[in-house]
Amino acid sequence: MHFLSPAKLNLFLQILGRREDDFHEIVTRYQAIAFGDQLSLSISSRDSLQVINACHLETPSNSIWKSVALFRRYTGITTPVSWRVVKQIPVGAGLAGGSSNAATALFALNQIFKTGLSDEEMRSLAEQLGVDTPFFFSTGAALGVARGEKIIALEESVSDRYVLYFSSEGVLTSRAFAAVQPSDCSSRKNLEYTQNDLEKPVFRLRLDLKEKKHWLENLWAELPVHIGLTGSGATLFVRYPEILEEDLSYAAQIQRAVTLSGGLLTSPIRRDPTAWYSIYSESALAAT
């Protein structure tokens, strides 16, 4: 069985302050995108995991094995399984690669063993696997509140396009939040639905990302786009309405900017509640 394990973007992320448990209260807009890893699952005589493009992730601490352990505890099924992952999502990129793998693995196990777990059950289990893991059991568009793990599904479609810019070095989420200062946080009465409050602390830690954003702002200056950081980084992204591509002049400028910058062009992706994210998305599997 084969499954797309999609990346996600934070279209905005607001930090509302520090909680009593020392975590930060946030509100964020999650969006699944048509780019990600490919997971293959089969029943086997022994447990195994192969990760193409990232063999250093073939460890017992991989998020996939955490899903397997949780599934086994919950269902009592202990049949060995074999995983093959074609890794495209960079580690520490702010794209939730590990969380997406965990969610996709949980869904895949439910499918292959026909255990009939509902989305609600899997979403509840996913809360034990990571803050943004439950999001992937939405339709692909949702608000995340509390620490980001409480999901409010959004039904409206987004007609956007995104250009992704990866970094050779990731950013640890814990390090990014540890660098947050009170002045970085948003007012509950004045939320901006395009900004990421983690940008300032991350840019203090990573001057190269700040400079890269300025370079992108200059490159895309003639186009009506938004440029931001997703999650705690290190991925930057350009966002623009898809309708721009219907204008030949804009389309040519977009193509030129994407080519000159070496970005990866992708789109939103939605999930049917009765299935998983489509593995047949051309842009999602272009690199596999």
Curated annotation (Swiss-Prot):
It comes from the Bacteria. Pathway: Isoprenoid biosynthesis; isopentenyl diphosphate biosynthesis via DXP pathway; isopentenyl diphosphate from 1-deoxy-D-xylulose 5-phosphate: step 3/6. Disulfide bonds: none annotated. ATP binds at residues 90-100. Its EC number is 2.7.1.148. It is an enzyme of class 2 (transferase). It catalyses: 4-CDP-2-C-methyl-D-erythritol + ATP = 4-CDP-2-C-methyl-D-erythritol 2-phosphate + ADP + H(+). The active site is at residues 8, 132. GO terms for biological process: isopentenyl diphosphate biosynthetic process, methylerythritol 4-phosphate pathway; terpenoid biosynthetic process. GO terms for molecular function: 4-(cytidine 5'-diphospho)-2-C-methyl-D-erythritol kinase activity; ATP binding. InterPro entries: GHMP_kinase_C_sf, GHMP_kinase_N_dom, IspE, Ribosomal_Su5_D2-typ_SF, Ribsml_uS5_D2-typ_fold_subgr. Keywords: ATP-binding, Isoprene biosynthesis, Kinase, Nucleotide-binding, Transferase. Belongs to the GHMP kinase family. IspE subfamily. Catalyzes the phosphorylation of the position 2 hydroxy group of 4-diphosphocytidyl-2C-methyl-D-erythritol. This is 4-diphosphocytidyl-2-C-methyl-D-erythritol kinase. The lineage of its organism: Bacteria, Pseudomonadati, Chlamydiota, Chlamydiia, Chlamydiales.
